[in-house]
Amino acid sequence: MQPIISVSNVSKTYASGLRALERVNLDIRRGEIFALLGPNGAGKTTLISIICGIVTLTEGTVSVAGYDIGRDYRVTRSMIGLVPQELTTDAFETVWATVSFSRGLFGKPRNPDYVAKVLKELSLWDRKDSKIMTLSGGMKRRVLIAKALSHEPQILFLDEPTAGVDVELRKDMWDIVRALRAEGVTIILTTHYIEEAEEMADRIGVMHGGKIILVEDKAELMHKLGKKQLTLHLQKRLDALPDALAAHRLTLAADGNEIIYTYDTQGERTGITALLKDLNLAGIRFRDLHTTQSSLEDIFVGLVRQRQ
């Protein structure tokens, strides 16, 4: 299947000489939720801005549903909705007016029924006649999503969609994103909340230093790069680990009351059997144990550190 977005060898150098992107290649599949992760300055917003036609690329090509973003600008832009990171809204306009106006900017005919549908799905219907300046930060962000959806785009970019939003509203946003995907909208999000990507994304892309350093299915990424930890809760506190256990690369934690063993989930052998045998020989007894899996945040931090 042809990707809905194809980025090929894209580079961007600003007038100041800053090289923001370096030969980026990326394909986005139709109907997926794709999370683009990376530290500040990695190039995420620049890449999104290029695809959306806001920033001009220096080298390379970008196509949307087979249309070139430069040659077929109006066609590609009409397929894309963008929710920016900043809360840029018309403070003195009503919710209804600003969403309807956004639809008109893309040359779409008036469609009150569709605008009403969007506002209801985003829980904005009761505030449709309210001036935007009277809304909370979370509601203003919903208005931005409504504006981005006003012209019925096939693709929705969410740049830090839950920045400054409380936990309850963040989970509401997650539900909104899932519902949009269920309707066939392709969604690309950038986020500093790694749990957000872990919760929603089908695939993960990681950027660092203006480059894409990894693109992987989320489940496969966590399987390949994730590690597990075995935590042993000791019967008696230890001041230090015996030299006989040095080969296991253990960590003494919880003020000497826990031993933590980290192992690779891809290894043929975990080493747990040998560890338990050596603990027994060393006279170390434990009262309980449990295992934990690396989170996406652990994997992301590890990938970025490798590049530093």
Describe the function of each predicted region.
Residues 100, 104-127:
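Conserved ABC ATPase "signature" region
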Residues 131-135:
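Conserved ABC ATPase signature
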Residues 152:
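Conserved catalytic motifs of ABC-family nucleotide-binding domains
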Residues 156-159:
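Catalytic Walker B motif of ABC-type/P-loop ATPase nucleotide-binding domains
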Residues 174-264:
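ABC transporter nucleotide-binding domain
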Residues 230-303, 307:
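Short, charged/small-residue-rich alpha-helical element at the C-terminal edge
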